[in-house]
Amino acid sequence: KADLERNSALIAERTGKSPRVLAWPYGRHNALTREIAAGLDMKVMLTLEDGINASDRPLDAIRRKIVRLQPDVGELAWQLTWLVAPPHPESMRVMHVDLDYIYDPDPGVQERNLGKLLDRVKAMGINTVFLQAYADPDGDGVADAVYFPNRHLPMRADLFGRAAWQLSSRTGVRVYAWMPLLAFKLPPSHPAAEDVVVSRRGMPTGAYRRLTPFSEKARSTISDIYQDLGRHAAFSGVLFHDDATLDEFEDDSPAAREAYRKAGLPGTAEAMDADASARSAWQEFKTRSLTAFSREMIDVLKRHQPDLKTARNIYARVVLEPAAQERFAQSLDDMLANYDWVALMAMPYLDGSADYAQFIERLVAAVDARPGALAKTVFELQAVDWRSRRPIDDMLTVRAMRL
């Protein structure tokens, strides 16, 4: 704020006019900097986001295009035409990157690993990286630590921000922060450490140990983690991990029971399980609750990453069998309406299917049955058969990509 005040006063002194328009350096801005600029009467702000400026575009987020390499008139006309009417919908060719494989306690080794990653990304010709921002060295799907400074979890290394910047600046890809929504392993002494998802009495718990989305302490903690992520790195989007689910026996924690009662539902999972009508309402309530909480985290991130895109993992079984919503608290229609992208886990052998190609064909047909859904769905293909730990035949993968 002091810099903007000083610069504004200097311009007014030298020109007799106070500045009213601010072009953000490298297009970088967030809600706080916009508020500061607006408070100094610079209410028109220029970003580096491509696109047209329609009448509903806010003045504090005016799009502009950088003209590079001195294009001729024809090339410039094509670029501008593409902005107004792209020849084909935006596509996503994505690679998942697990920072646990880049991290090393030896800084030299870690730097070499990062360099190899950049080379690999360039060679693959992709346009998007889902970059894991949390540490899961034991592979149980729960964040034991994270790769950015934060208030609640151990920081294994301050690696995410650097890797995201290197990937975006040196390879040109869009980087999405790949994050759990609920699966955080807080230190034992943390006030919210035991506010976890609980299964109905006598039933096994789900695949992941998760903080319950119905506890205010847990929600506040997760919100802080997302706020710290947004403050300490620059990235294009967020991918919510496949932990954002509640099965047919969850959640029966005290906080969840209280939330059910407030929503007019029976107060326990067992009571709802015994009533078909209540059970259906319970399923919908859980699905809506997970989506609503993820939307809150999106709003938290957008305070620092205003042009953030969003994606969320969905299990294939939910797409193939709508009744499976009960087992996952997920819905394809709900996700299509609430995120820029749906990241569909198209992994036949994970789902127990013996026919790889047929499974993918069924998935594509199920998504295509919804108008416009294919354009918003990215199919995450299984490249390794985890049962045998052997790579899947390249021709099967190529065939799936061509569908």
Give the ranges of each region predicted by the language model.
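The substrate-binding groove and active-site-proximal loops of carbohydrate-active enzymes
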Residues: 20, 66-67, 93-108, 144-157, ...
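Conserved, mostly hydrophobic/aromatic
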Residues: 7, 22, 37, 121, ...
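Polysaccharide-binding and catalytic clefts of secreted carbohydrate-active enzymes
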Residues: 1, 120, 199-350
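C-terminal active-site subregion of NodB/CE4 polysaccharide deacetylases
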Residues: 1-93
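Catalytic domains of carbohydrate-active enzymes, especially glycoside hydrolases
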Residues: 112-139, 232-237, 335-343, 403
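Active-site clefts of carbohydrate-active enzymes
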Residues: 88-100, 277, 308-319, 365-399
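Aromatic-lined substrate-binding rim segments of carbohydrate-active enzymes
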Residues: 115-118, 122, 135-183, 278-305
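Active-site-adjacent "subsite" loops/lids of carbohydrate-active enzymes
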Residues: 88-111, 164-165, 174-233, 268-276
